[in-house]
Structures are given as C-alpha cells and as structure tokens.
Amino acid sequence: MIGNWNYGTGRRKSAVARVFIKSGKGDIIVNGKPIKEYFARETSLMIVRQPLELTAHAETFDIKVNVTGGGETGQAGAVRHGITRALIDYDATLKPTLSKAGYVTRDAREVERKKVGLHKARRRKQFSKR
C-alpha cells in the first residue's frame, strides 16, 4: 500500500499496466484519459470492469492506470490483471472469488516467432505436386 492507494501490476502479451486504487466514486483514468475515451471498443471496457463487477466494487474505487506496450486487447487484459492484484492488495479475502473466475492467473500466451522458410509462424509455402 502506497499512502492510501493500493497497487497492482498486470501483464498481458507485451502490455504492462501499473494500477493504483483508492476509495472513491468509481472513476477510472487510463494514461490521463477517462476509460471510455482511452478504450474505443465496448469489449475492452467490459474486460477492464470484470473484476470490479464480480466483487461488487464497481462504484467504490477511483482507479488510476499507467499502461504501456501492446495493442488494445493486450492493454485491456493487463489492466484487468492489475485491477485484480490491486483488489487483492486491498482485501485478501477477495482472492478466492477472483481466482475462481480466472482473473488472478496471468495469461501466458505470447505471439509465436516466425520461422525461417515459412510464411508465418506455422504457415508453410503452398505445396505444388506438379
């Protein structure tokens, strides 16, 4: 806990989010912008709010987020992971609920590298019989 802020770091793909939460009225600021301005897609907004809605804390915290790297989906997942960790820092009794929903576990899937002689990571050149 930093002052009266609770902290959590979230990661997803190549995105990293540093999340600070404190008691408030439900404002979420991402990189200095309101969340609806920062995340254009409705699915990204839903992903970010999932741990708050699950624990019934959607209107009880002000959240400040610094997120870097990745794209919109990766950043949304990183923010969700960070909010989850910050909620656990605030109240450890929330961990079983969040863990059962799968929000505590870091999604370890990363982009597979492109291999030499292939078009993409696994896509081969088209085979010609003749």
UniProtKB/Swiss-Prot annotation:
GO CC terms in record: cytosolic small ribosomal subunit
GO biological process annotation, one example: translation
Keyword DNA repair: no
PROSITE patterns given in the database record: RIBOSOMAL_S9 (PS00360)
Molecular function per GO: RNA binding; structural constituent of ribosome
Annotated InterPro entries: Ribosomal_Su5_D2-typ_SF, Ribosomal_uS9, Ribosomal_uS9_bac/plastid, Ribosomal_uS9_CS, Ribsml_uS5_D2-typ_fold_subgr
Keyword line: Ribonucleoprotein, Ribosomal protein
Superkingdom of origin: Bacteria
Family statement drawn from the similarity comment of this UniProt entry: Belongs to the universal ribosomal protein uS9 family.
Protein name per UniProt: Small ribosomal subunit protein uS9
